[in-house]
Design a protein with these regions (language model features):
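Terminal, non-globular segments
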Residues: 1-193
């Protein structure tokens, strides 16, 4: 009896040598997702350093790159975004636009602690992500201020400027949220919160 095309055929036991190195559809989607996140951080870094550094509101500017890194961590969760957070903070420090090397552990630790709190106690929604992002950004700016004040680079009166910088960064965060949320949907949900 002749086989028909719609009948069951067993899988091939061995693939070609090239097929072993080709990424699967899920791997391609994950690579696309994290590449788009990296591109978003890079574009925000360029936008911050080229355009927004010239726009001063009450003597301060926004700080979009740490805000975006922390937003991505809030959306993706601590387990999936920890390596991205470390590498993005490393590139932020290496770009020369960060206040110092202490920013890398500050961004990473604050983002991971607040993200773990959000994952453990709050649902994933715009309100909870924005509230946790506000805590993280204000905490980051206060750590930057404390280190700068202890090292003698700023006066205590500049604390309002750091608070205003955090508020300006949070004012831009609702514009970043839809972009990051759209990228987060690539590849489907790995688990539901």
């Amino acid at each position: 009896m002749a086989r028909r095309s719609f009948e069951y055929r067993p899988d091939r036991t061995e693939g070609s040598l090239l097929a072993r190195f080709l990424p699967t559809k899920k791997q391609r989607q994950k690579l696309l997702k994290w590449s788009l996140y990296s591109l978003l951080v890079l574009v925000l870094s360029l936008l911050q350093d080229v355009l927004l550094c010239k726009v001063r509101i009450l003597g301060t500017t926004t700080d979009l790159v740490p805000c975006c890194i922390m937003l991505i961590c809030m959306l993706e969760g601590a387990q999936r975004s920890s390596i991205f957070c470390v590498t993005a903070a490393l590139f932020f420090v290496a770009s020369g636009s960060s206040p110092g090397y202490y920013v890398m552990p500050a961004i990473t630790l604050i983002a991971m602690v607040v993200t773990m709190f959000r994952q453990g106690y709050l649902r994933l929604s715009f309100g909870t992500v924005f509230a946790c992002l506000a805590v993280a950004v204000f905490g980051y700016e206060m750590i930057v201020f404390a280190v700068e004040w202890i090292s003698g680079r700023v006066l205590l009166e500049r604390m309002t400027a750091f608070t205003l910088k955090a508020a300006l960064s949070l004012a831009v965060a609702p514009l970043l949220y839809p972009m990051a949320a759209a990228i987060e949907k690539i590849g489907g949900e790995s688990w539901k919160e």
